[in-house]
Protein backbone atom coordinates (compact mmCIF):
# COMPACT_ATOMS: atom_id res chain seq x y z
CA UNK A 1 0.00 0.00 0.00
CA UNK A 2 1.38 3.35 -0.91
CA UNK A 3 1.95 5.73 1.97
CA UNK A 4 -0.04 8.94 1.86
CA UNK A 5 2.60 10.75 3.89
CA UNK A 6 4.29 13.55 2.01
CA UNK A 7 8.03 13.54 2.44
CA UNK A 8 10.58 16.19 1.66
CA UNK A 9 12.71 15.29 -1.36
CA UNK A 10 16.46 14.92 -1.09
CA UNK A 11 18.13 18.15 -2.12
CA UNK A 12 21.86 18.45 -2.74
CA UNK A 13 23.74 21.53 -1.60
CA UNK A 14 25.49 23.24 -4.49
CA UNK A 15 27.62 26.25 -3.66
CA UNK A 16 30.12 25.83 -6.47
CA UNK A 17 28.89 29.03 -8.11
CA UNK A 18 30.31 31.07 -5.22
CA UNK A 19 34.08 31.43 -5.67
CA UNK A 20 34.52 32.89 -2.19
CA UNK A 21 32.43 33.24 0.95
CA UNK A 22 33.07 36.77 2.14
CA UNK A 23 30.09 36.71 4.44
CA UNK A 24 28.82 33.94 6.67
CA UNK A 25 25.19 34.84 6.05
CA UNK A 26 25.50 33.88 2.37
CA UNK A 27 26.22 30.33 3.46
CA UNK A 28 23.36 30.61 5.94
CA UNK A 29 20.93 31.54 3.13
CA UNK A 30 21.99 28.48 1.15
CA UNK A 31 21.42 26.23 4.15
CA UNK A 32 18.02 27.76 4.92
CA UNK A 33 17.02 26.97 1.34
CA UNK A 34 17.38 23.28 2.18
CA UNK A 35 15.33 23.65 5.35
CA UNK A 36 12.20 24.97 3.67
CA UNK A 37 9.62 22.40 2.59
CA UNK A 38 7.65 22.46 -0.64
CA UNK A 39 4.31 24.03 0.24
CA UNK A 40 2.77 24.96 -3.17
CA UNK A 41 0.17 22.20 -2.95
CA UNK A 42 -1.68 23.96 -0.10
CA UNK A 43 -3.91 27.02 -0.27
CA UNK A 44 -5.01 29.13 2.63
CA UNK A 45 -8.19 31.07 3.24
CA UNK A 46 -8.51 34.83 2.62
CA UNK A 47 -9.37 35.96 6.09
CA UNK A 48 -5.92 35.03 7.41
CA UNK A 49 -4.38 37.47 4.92
CA UNK A 50 -6.30 40.34 6.50
CA UNK A 51 -4.79 39.57 9.93
CA UNK A 52 -1.38 39.60 8.34
CA UNK A 53 -1.83 43.12 6.89
CA UNK A 54 -3.04 44.52 10.23
CA UNK A 55 0.23 43.70 12.02
CA UNK A 56 2.95 45.68 10.27
CA UNK A 57 5.68 44.96 12.83
CA UNK A 58 5.99 41.34 11.58
CA UNK A 59 5.71 42.16 7.84
CA UNK A 60 9.48 42.25 7.34
CA UNK A 61 9.93 38.70 8.64
CA UNK A 62 7.08 37.48 6.43
CA UNK A 63 8.72 38.89 3.32
CA UNK A 64 12.06 37.29 4.17
CA UNK A 65 10.48 33.84 4.50
CA UNK A 66 8.48 34.45 1.32
CA UNK A 67 11.66 35.20 -0.64
CA UNK A 68 13.44 32.17 0.75
CA UNK A 69 10.54 29.85 -0.08
CA UNK A 70 10.33 31.19 -3.66
CA UNK A 71 14.03 30.62 -4.17
CA UNK A 72 13.63 27.11 -2.79
CA UNK A 73 10.98 26.25 -5.36
CA UNK A 74 13.43 26.95 -8.18
CA UNK A 75 15.86 24.23 -7.04
CA UNK A 76 13.68 21.68 -5.24
CA UNK A 77 12.14 19.01 -7.50
CA UNK A 78 8.46 18.29 -7.08
CA UNK A 79 7.09 14.96 -5.88
CA UNK A 80 5.37 14.64 -9.28
CA UNK A 81 8.79 14.53 -10.95
CA UNK A 82 9.77 11.56 -8.82
CA UNK A 83 6.49 9.87 -9.67
CA UNK A 84 7.16 10.36 -13.40
CA UNK A 85 10.21 8.09 -13.10
CA UNK A 86 8.32 5.44 -11.18
CA UNK A 87 9.78 6.28 -7.75
CA UNK A 88 6.97 5.99 -5.25
CA UNK A 89 8.85 5.60 -1.96
CA UNK A 90 11.24 8.45 -1.37
CA UNK A 91 14.14 8.26 1.05
CA UNK A 92 13.16 10.16 4.14
CA UNK A 93 16.45 11.86 4.75
CA UNK A 94 16.25 14.79 7.09
CA UNK A 95 18.50 17.67 6.06
CA UNK A 96 16.96 20.11 8.51
CA UNK A 97 19.54 22.05 10.45
CA UNK A 98 18.31 24.16 13.38
CA UNK A 99 18.46 27.79 12.44
CA UNK A 100 19.66 28.79 15.90
CA UNK A 101 22.87 26.78 15.37
CA UNK A 102 23.41 28.41 11.99
CA UNK A 103 22.70 31.88 13.30
CA UNK A 104 25.02 31.41 16.24
CA UNK A 105 28.02 31.21 13.92
CA UNK A 106 27.38 34.61 12.37
CA UNK A 107 28.67 37.88 13.76
CA UNK A 108 26.79 41.10 14.38
CA UNK A 109 28.24 42.84 11.35
CA UNK A 110 27.25 40.01 9.00
CA UNK A 111 23.72 40.04 10.42
CA UNK A 112 23.41 43.77 9.77
CA UNK A 113 24.71 43.49 6.21
CA UNK A 114 22.36 40.60 5.52
CA UNK A 115 19.36 42.49 6.85
CA UNK A 116 20.20 45.38 4.52
CA UNK A 117 20.38 43.02 1.54
CA UNK A 118 17.06 41.47 2.57
CA UNK A 119 15.38 44.88 2.75
CA UNK A 120 16.69 45.83 -0.69
CA UNK A 121 15.30 42.66 -2.23
CA UNK A 122 11.89 42.86 -0.56
CA UNK A 123 10.31 45.06 -3.23
CA UNK A 124 11.50 42.88 -6.08
CA UNK A 125 10.24 39.73 -4.39
CA UNK A 126 6.79 41.24 -3.85
CA UNK A 127 6.53 42.17 -7.52
CA UNK A 128 7.56 38.74 -8.71
CA UNK A 129 5.19 37.01 -6.35
CA UNK A 130 2.22 39.11 -7.47
CA UNK A 131 3.06 38.45 -11.12
CA UNK A 132 3.33 34.72 -10.66
CA UNK A 133 -0.05 34.41 -8.95
CA UNK A 134 -2.87 35.40 -11.36
CA UNK A 135 -5.50 34.31 -8.90
CA UNK A 136 -4.90 37.43 -6.81
CA UNK A 137 -3.47 35.73 -3.73
CA UNK A 138 -0.31 36.93 -2.07
CA UNK A 139 3.02 35.21 -2.61
CA UNK A 140 2.82 33.79 0.85
CA UNK A 141 -0.35 31.94 -0.04
CA UNK A 142 1.30 30.50 -3.15
CA UNK A 143 4.16 29.17 -1.07
CA UNK A 144 1.68 27.48 1.22
CA UNK A 145 2.49 29.17 4.54
CA UNK A 146 0.33 31.76 6.33
CA UNK A 147 1.06 33.92 9.37
CA UNK A 148 -1.28 34.73 12.21
CA UNK A 149 -1.63 37.94 14.19
CA UNK A 150 1.28 37.12 16.48
CA UNK A 151 3.77 36.79 13.63
CA UNK A 152 3.80 32.99 13.73
CA UNK A 153 3.00 30.52 11.00
CA UNK A 154 -0.52 29.09 11.16
CA UNK A 155 -0.90 25.36 10.79
CA UNK A 156 -2.79 24.13 7.73
CA UNK A 157 -4.48 20.87 6.93
CA UNK A 158 -1.45 19.75 4.96
CA UNK A 159 0.67 19.77 8.11
CA UNK A 160 -1.25 16.79 9.44
CA UNK A 161 -1.29 13.25 8.11
CA UNK A 162 -4.53 11.33 8.16
CA UNK A 163 -3.79 7.86 9.45
CA UNK A 164 -5.99 4.78 9.52
CA UNK A 165 -7.41 5.58 12.93
CA UNK A 166 -8.64 8.96 11.82
CA UNK A 167 -6.40 10.93 14.15
CA UNK A 168 -4.37 13.88 12.96
CA UNK A 169 -0.62 13.64 13.47
CA UNK A 170 1.69 16.51 12.59
CA UNK A 171 4.48 15.55 10.24
CA UNK A 172 7.99 15.83 11.67
CA UNK A 173 9.30 18.08 8.93
CA UNK A 174 6.43 20.52 9.53
CA UNK A 175 7.16 20.53 13.27
CA UNK A 176 10.78 21.44 12.62
CA UNK A 177 9.77 24.16 10.17
CA UNK A 178 7.38 25.75 12.66
CA UNK A 179 10.01 25.64 15.40
CA UNK A 180 12.58 27.28 13.15
CA UNK A 181 10.17 30.00 12.03
CA UNK A 182 9.34 30.78 15.67
CA UNK A 183 12.99 31.18 16.60
CA UNK A 184 14.04 33.26 13.60
CA UNK A 185 12.23 36.52 14.68
CA UNK A 186 13.92 36.23 18.07
CA UNK A 187 17.30 35.87 16.40
CA UNK A 188 16.64 38.91 14.19
CA UNK A 189 15.72 41.01 17.23
CA UNK A 190 18.93 40.02 18.96
CA UNK A 191 20.96 41.06 15.92
CA UNK A 192 19.24 44.46 15.79
CA UNK A 193 20.10 45.27 19.41
CA UNK A 194 23.78 45.69 18.47
CA UNK A 195 25.20 43.81 21.48
CA UNK A 196 28.95 43.46 21.31
CA UNK A 197 30.90 41.11 23.60
CA UNK A 198 34.61 41.77 23.85
CA UNK A 199 36.82 38.73 24.23
CA UNK A 200 39.46 39.36 26.83
CA UNK A 201 42.45 37.05 26.82
CA UNK A 202 42.94 35.16 30.07
CA UNK A 203 46.16 33.23 29.54
CA UNK A 204 49.77 34.27 29.10
CA UNK A 205 49.95 32.82 25.59
CA UNK A 206 46.90 34.80 24.45
CA UNK A 207 48.31 37.97 25.98
CA UNK A 208 51.58 37.41 24.13
CA UNK A 209 49.71 36.68 20.90
CA UNK A 210 47.64 39.83 21.30
CA UNK A 211 50.78 41.87 21.89
CA UNK A 212 52.62 40.42 18.88
CA UNK A 213 49.57 40.69 16.58
CA UNK A 214 47.71 43.89 17.49
CA UNK A 215 45.70 43.87 14.28
CA UNK A 216 43.87 40.61 15.06
CA UNK A 217 42.44 41.49 18.46
CA UNK A 218 41.79 45.21 18.60
CA UNK A 219 39.66 45.02 21.73
CA UNK A 220 42.54 44.20 24.06
CA UNK A 221 45.88 45.50 22.91
CA UNK A 222 47.37 46.37 26.28
CA UNK A 223 47.83 43.24 28.41
CA UNK A 224 49.53 45.30 31.08
CA UNK A 225 46.14 46.69 32.14
CA UNK A 226 44.84 43.19 32.89
CA UNK A 227 48.03 41.77 34.44
CA UNK A 228 49.25 44.71 36.51
CA UNK A 229 50.65 43.47 39.86
CA UNK A 230 52.08 45.88 42.43
CA UNK A 231 55.81 45.59 43.02
CA UNK A 232 55.56 45.20 46.77
CA UNK A 233 53.48 42.01 46.52
CA UNK A 234 56.15 40.08 44.63
CA UNK A 235 59.63 39.50 46.06
CA UNK A 236 62.59 40.26 43.89
CA UNK A 237 63.61 36.67 43.33
CA UNK A 238 60.01 35.59 42.52
CA UNK A 239 59.64 38.36 39.94
CA UNK A 240 62.52 36.79 38.05
CA UNK A 241 60.73 33.45 38.02
CA UNK A 242 57.79 35.00 36.15
CA UNK A 243 60.14 36.82 33.78
CA UNK A 244 60.74 33.99 31.24
CA UNK A 245 57.03 33.06 31.23
CA UNK A 246 55.64 36.55 30.66
CA UNK A 247 58.26 37.85 28.24
CA UNK A 248 58.40 34.73 26.09
CA UNK A 249 57.59 36.74 22.96
CA UNK A 250 59.90 39.64 23.88
CA UNK A 251 63.17 37.74 24.29
CA UNK A 252 64.40 38.88 20.89
CA UNK A 253 64.04 42.51 21.99
CA UNK A 254 65.83 42.16 25.35
CA UNK A 255 69.54 42.77 25.69
CA UNK A 256 71.85 39.89 26.76
CA UNK A 257 73.43 41.83 29.62
CA UNK A 258 70.01 42.51 31.20
CA UNK A 259 69.19 38.80 31.28
CA UNK A 260 72.58 37.95 32.78
CA UNK A 261 72.08 40.62 35.41
CA UNK A 262 68.67 39.17 36.38
CA UNK A 263 70.14 35.66 36.61
CA UNK A 264 73.03 36.81 38.79
CA UNK A 265 70.60 38.69 41.03
CA UNK A 266 68.45 35.57 41.45
CA UNK A 267 71.54 33.51 42.26
CA UNK A 268 72.62 35.92 45.00
CA UNK A 269 69.16 35.89 46.57
CA UNK A 270 69.12 32.10 46.43
CA UNK A 271 72.51 31.86 48.15
CA UNK A 272 71.47 34.26 50.89
CA UNK A 273 68.36 32.20 51.63
CA UNK A 274 70.50 29.08 52.15
CA UNK A 275 73.22 30.82 54.15
CA UNK A 276 70.64 31.85 56.73
CA UNK A 277 70.03 28.19 57.60
CA UNK A 278 73.65 27.46 58.56
CA UNK A 279 74.27 27.70 62.36
CA UNK A 280 77.18 29.54 63.88
CA UNK A 281 78.91 26.41 65.24
CA UNK A 282 78.39 24.28 62.13
CA UNK A 283 82.08 23.84 61.29
CA UNK A 284 83.52 22.79 64.66
CA UNK A 285 81.72 20.62 67.20
CA UNK A 286 78.55 20.36 65.12
CA UNK A 287 75.57 18.42 66.38
CA UNK A 288 74.45 17.57 62.85
CA UNK A 289 75.01 14.03 61.64
CA UNK A 290 75.81 12.82 58.15
CA UNK A 291 72.12 12.13 57.49
CA UNK A 292 71.23 15.78 58.18
CA UNK A 293 73.92 16.93 55.80
CA UNK A 294 72.69 14.59 53.09
CA UNK A 295 69.11 15.83 53.54
CA UNK A 296 70.26 19.45 53.17
CA UNK A 297 72.25 18.64 50.02
CA UNK A 298 69.27 16.77 48.57
CA UNK A 299 66.90 19.68 49.25
CA UNK A 300 69.34 22.15 47.67
CA UNK A 301 69.67 20.07 44.48
CA UNK A 302 65.90 19.67 44.23
CA UNK A 303 65.41 23.42 44.57
CA UNK A 304 67.93 24.12 41.79
CA UNK A 305 66.33 21.56 39.49
CA UNK A 306 62.85 23.01 40.10
CA UNK A 307 64.09 26.52 39.27
CA UNK A 308 65.62 25.31 36.01
CA UNK A 309 62.37 23.52 35.10
CA UNK A 310 60.28 26.66 35.73
CA UNK A 311 62.54 28.76 33.54
CA UNK A 312 62.21 26.29 30.68
CA UNK A 313 65.92 25.97 30.13
CA UNK A 314 66.55 29.72 30.02
CA UNK A 315 68.53 29.75 33.26
CA UNK A 316 70.89 26.81 33.04
CA UNK A 317 73.02 25.71 36.01
CA UNK A 318 76.12 26.91 34.21
CA UNK A 319 74.88 30.50 34.05
CA UNK A 320 74.01 30.53 37.76
CA UNK A 321 77.67 30.72 38.71
CA UNK A 322 79.39 34.06 39.25
CA UNK A 323 82.22 35.09 36.97
CA UNK A 324 84.60 35.76 39.84
CA UNK A 325 83.66 32.80 42.06
CA UNK A 326 85.74 29.65 42.18
CA UNK A 327 82.81 27.22 41.73
CA UNK A 328 79.07 27.18 41.05
CA UNK A 329 76.26 26.23 43.39
CA UNK A 330 76.07 22.73 42.00
CA UNK A 331 79.82 22.19 42.34
CA UNK A 332 79.95 23.58 45.89
CA UNK A 333 79.89 20.15 47.53
CA UNK A 334 82.36 18.52 45.12
CA UNK A 335 84.78 21.07 43.62
CA UNK A 336 85.94 22.73 46.81
CA UNK A 337 82.96 24.76 48.01
CA UNK A 338 82.73 23.24 51.54
CA UNK A 339 80.06 25.64 52.80
CA UNK A 340 77.45 22.97 53.48
CA UNK A 341 79.76 20.07 54.40
CA UNK A 342 79.94 19.29 58.11
CA UNK A 343 82.86 17.50 59.77
CA UNK A 344 82.21 13.80 60.07
CA UNK A 345 81.85 12.38 63.51
CA UNK A 346 82.31 8.67 64.11
CA UNK A 347 79.27 7.17 65.70
CA UNK A 348 79.13 3.98 67.72
CA UNK A 349 78.12 1.01 65.70
CA UNK A 350 74.65 -0.07 66.63
CA UNK A 351 74.31 -3.83 67.17
CA UNK A 352 71.96 -5.71 64.97
CA UNK A 353 68.83 -7.46 66.15
CA UNK A 354 70.49 -10.88 66.21
CA UNK A 355 73.34 -9.59 68.35
CA UNK A 356 70.93 -7.95 70.78
CA UNK A 357 68.94 -11.18 71.05
CA UNK A 358 72.04 -13.28 71.74
CA UNK A 359 73.27 -10.86 74.37
CA UNK A 360 69.92 -10.83 76.15
CA UNK A 361 69.73 -14.63 76.19
CA UNK A 362 73.25 -14.89 77.61
CA UNK A 363 72.40 -12.44 80.38
CA UNK A 364 69.29 -14.42 81.22
CA UNK A 365 71.19 -17.70 81.41
CA UNK A 366 73.81 -16.21 83.71
CA UNK A 367 71.10 -14.80 86.01
CA UNK A 368 69.49 -18.24 86.26
CA UNK A 369 72.84 -19.82 87.13
CA UNK A 370 73.45 -17.28 89.87
CA UNK A 371 69.97 -17.88 91.31
CA UNK A 372 70.52 -21.63 91.45
CA UNK A 373 73.86 -21.19 93.14
CA UNK A 374 72.36 -18.91 95.77
CA UNK A 375 69.54 -21.35 96.52
CA UNK A 376 71.99 -24.24 96.74
CA UNK A 377 74.28 -22.40 99.13
CA UNK A 378 71.30 -21.45 101.32
CA UNK A 379 70.16 -25.05 101.52
CA UNK A 380 73.66 -26.16 102.46
CA UNK A 381 73.76 -23.57 105.27
CA UNK A 382 70.48 -24.78 106.73
CA UNK A 383 71.66 -28.39 106.63
CA UNK A 384 74.83 -27.55 108.52
CA UNK A 385 72.83 -25.55 111.06
CA UNK A 386 70.50 -28.46 111.66
CA UNK A 387 73.53 -30.69 112.27
CA UNK A 388 74.90 -28.35 114.95
CA UNK A 389 71.65 -27.73 116.83
CA UNK A 390 70.62 -30.65 119.07
CA UNK A 391 67.40 -32.10 117.66
CA UNK A 392 65.15 -34.98 118.40
CA UNK A 393 64.70 -37.92 116.02
CA UNK A 394 61.08 -36.96 115.45
CA UNK A 395 61.87 -33.38 114.31
CA UNK A 396 61.09 -32.38 110.70
CA UNK A 397 62.03 -28.76 110.77
CA UNK A 398 61.46 -26.19 108.07
CA UNK A 399 63.81 -23.32 107.48
CA UNK A 400 61.86 -21.00 109.76
CA UNK A 401 61.63 -23.62 112.53
CA UNK A 402 65.34 -24.32 112.20
CA UNK A 403 66.12 -20.62 112.69
CA UNK A 404 63.88 -20.39 115.76
CA UNK A 405 65.47 -23.49 117.31
CA UNK A 406 68.89 -22.03 116.66
CA UNK A 407 68.00 -18.88 118.59
CA UNK A 408 66.81 -20.94 121.54
CA UNK A 409 69.98 -22.99 121.54
CA UNK A 410 72.09 -19.85 121.57
CA UNK A 411 70.08 -18.57 124.52
CA UNK A 412 70.62 -21.84 126.36
CA UNK A 413 74.35 -21.68 125.89
CA UNK A 414 74.46 -18.11 127.21
CA UNK A 415 72.62 -19.13 130.35
CA UNK A 416 74.92 -22.07 130.88
CA UNK A 417 78.00 -19.90 130.79
CA UNK A 418 76.59 -17.13 132.99
CA UNK A 419 74.99 -19.19 135.78
CA UNK A 420 77.90 -21.65 136.39
CA UNK A 421 76.04 -24.81 135.51
CA UNK A 422 79.07 -26.96 136.13
CA UNK A 423 77.36 -28.28 139.27
CA UNK A 424 74.50 -29.41 137.07
CA UNK A 425 76.89 -31.49 135.11
CA UNK A 426 78.27 -33.02 138.31
CA UNK A 427 74.75 -33.84 139.46
CA UNK A 428 73.98 -35.51 136.22
CA UNK A 429 77.13 -37.54 136.45
CA UNK A 430 76.24 -38.55 140.00
CA UNK A 431 72.81 -39.78 139.01
CA UNK A 432 74.19 -41.68 136.05
CA UNK A 433 70.79 -41.94 134.43
CA UNK A 434 69.96 -39.41 131.73
CA UNK A 435 66.34 -40.55 131.67
CA UNK A 436 65.33 -38.69 134.79
CA UNK A 437 63.46 -35.83 133.10
CA UNK A 438 61.30 -35.24 136.15
CA UNK A 439 64.18 -33.85 138.22
CA UNK A 440 65.29 -31.47 135.49
CA UNK A 441 63.78 -28.48 137.25
CA UNK A 442 65.50 -29.33 140.52
CA UNK A 443 68.72 -29.76 138.74
CA UNK A 444 68.40 -26.38 137.12
CA UNK A 445 67.57 -24.72 140.42
CA UNK A 446 70.51 -26.44 142.10
CA UNK A 447 72.73 -25.29 139.35
CA UNK A 448 71.45 -21.78 139.88
CA UNK A 449 72.01 -21.99 143.62
CA UNK A 450 75.19 -24.07 143.36
CA UNK A 451 78.28 -23.42 145.26
CA UNK A 452 80.51 -20.96 143.64
CA UNK A 453 83.49 -22.10 145.62
CA UNK A 454 83.71 -25.36 143.81
CA UNK A 455 83.48 -23.58 140.48
CA UNK A 456 86.24 -21.17 141.40
CA UNK A 457 88.48 -24.00 142.54
CA UNK A 458 87.94 -25.88 139.31
CA UNK A 459 88.72 -22.80 137.27
CA UNK A 460 91.89 -22.09 139.17
CA UNK A 461 93.09 -25.66 139.03
CA UNK A 462 92.05 -26.88 135.63
CA UNK A 463 91.18 -23.67 133.80
CA UNK A 464 87.94 -23.50 131.80
CA UNK A 465 85.87 -26.62 131.87
CA UNK A 466 85.48 -28.59 128.65
CA UNK A 467 81.90 -29.87 128.14
CA UNK A 468 81.47 -32.59 125.52
CA UNK A 469 78.85 -31.92 122.79
CA UNK A 470 76.73 -34.94 123.61
CA UNK A 471 76.25 -33.68 127.14
CA UNK A 472 75.25 -30.21 125.87
CA UNK A 473 72.81 -31.78 123.50
CA UNK A 474 71.24 -33.76 126.27
CA UNK A 475 70.93 -30.77 128.55
CA UNK A 476 69.47 -28.63 125.72
CA UNK A 477 66.91 -31.32 124.98
CA UNK A 478 65.85 -31.41 128.63
CA UNK A 479 65.64 -27.60 128.80
CA UNK A 480 63.69 -27.45 125.54
CA UNK A 481 61.10 -29.97 126.68
CA UNK A 482 60.57 -28.15 129.99
CA UNK A 483 60.10 -24.87 128.13
CA UNK A 484 57.52 -26.35 125.81
CA UNK A 485 55.63 -27.85 128.74
CA UNK A 486 55.54 -24.51 130.52
CA UNK A 487 54.36 -22.79 127.38
CA UNK A 488 51.50 -25.25 126.98
CA UNK A 489 50.40 -24.79 130.60
CA UNK A 490 50.40 -21.05 130.21
UniProtKB/Swiss-Prot annotation:
GO molecular function, one term: RNA polymerase II transcription regulatory region sequence-specific DNA binding
An individual GO BP term: mesodermal cell fate commitment
Annotated SMART domains: HLH
Entry GO CC: nucleus
Gene coding for it: twi
Protein's job: Involved in the establishment and dorsoventral patterning of germ layers in the embryo.
Subunit structure, as described in the record: Efficient DNA binding requires dimerization with another bHLH protein. Homodimer.
Regions of compositional bias (Basic residues) in chain numbering: 54-64, 339-351
Keyword terms: Developmental protein, Differentiation, DNA-binding, Nucleus, Transcription, Transcription regulation
Compositional bias (Low complexity): 65-74, 104-135
Annotated ranges, domain bHLH: 362-413
Classification via PROSITE patterns: BHLH
Region described as Disordered: 48-74, 98-167, 330-359
Subcellular location: Nucleus
InterPro entries, per database record: bHLH_dom, E-box_TF_Regulators, HLH_DNA-bd_sf, Twist-rel_bHLH
Major localisation: nucleus
Identification of the protein by name: Protein twist
